[in-house]
Regions:
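Von Willebrand factor
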Residues: 1-45, 53-94, 97-101, 126-140, 151-161, ...
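Short, well-ordered amphipathic alpha-helices
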Residues: 13-21, 74-84, 113-116
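P-loop NTP-binding core
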Residues: 18, 86-90, 193
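Short beta-strand-loop
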Residues: 28-58, 138-144
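Von Willebrand factor A/integrin I-like adhesion domains
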Residues: 134-185, 189, 195-196
């Protein structure tokens, strides 16, 4: 993702953080982490309480591979390190929500296929995948989750609507790890298409 699309993602992230900061419950319970994946996989923002989030600058290469599998491996390590499970003696963290956005397909397909069962073992309240742009492939995302969406227009208005929906999803997704009911997300905006 380069140029206007990545700038639009940045605007959308800023709008999401601003929106969440107006929700007193989110201020007390939401934490945000950002992992980027292209030819390098990086934790740009470790799991950080919402009130302390300073969005980092997201830089992308001109072109190159999309290491989605390596990103999910790093995600599993970060979840294991940063998220506290509930025990009989101690209340744990809220169940995390995973929002994965890609404008391509996994370049490291074998790693991607191998890590999917590990991701599913983690205690996510929901895993939502977004195929952004016409070159994004939904088939690999459907292996990860049933909740796959497409965003065909990569402008700031579309990304703002997408991240507004993400904010609303975070609001309904704050549940303790160990809850068993499926999370029902709010309906997506018209800019976001459901993949069936």
């Amino acid at each position: 993702m380069k140029g206007e699309p990545i700038e639009s993602v940045k605007v959308g992230l800023e709008a999401m953080v601003s929106s969440l900061r107006t929700d007193p419950f989110a201020l007390e319970s939401a934490n945000i982490s950002i992992i980027t994946f292209d030819r390098e996989v990086k934790v740009l923002l470790p799991l950080t309480p919402l009130e302390d989030v300073q969005l980092p600058n997201i830089e992308t290469p001109e072109s190159g591979p999309t290491h989605t599998g390596a990103a999910l491996e790093l995600l599993c390590k970060q979840i294991d390190k940063e998220v506290t499970l509930s025990t009989p003696e101690k209340k744990g963290d809220w169940m995390p929500l995973l929002f994965l956005m890609t404008d391509g397909k996994p370049s490291d397909l074998q790693v991607y296929n191998n890590i999917i069962p590990e991701v599913k073992k983690r205690h996510f309240a929901s895993i939502v995948a977004c195929a952004a742009g016409m070159k994004a492939k939904v088939e690999p995302l459907k292996q990860l989750t049933d909740q796959v969406y497409t965003l065909d227009t990569l402008d700031s208005s579309s990304f703002k609507q997408f991240f507004k929906w993400v904010s609303a999803s975070i609001g309904v997704g704050n549940r303790s790890i160990g809850a068993t009911d499926d999370l029902v997300l709010p309906p997506p905006p018209e800019e976001v298409n459901v993949v069936i």
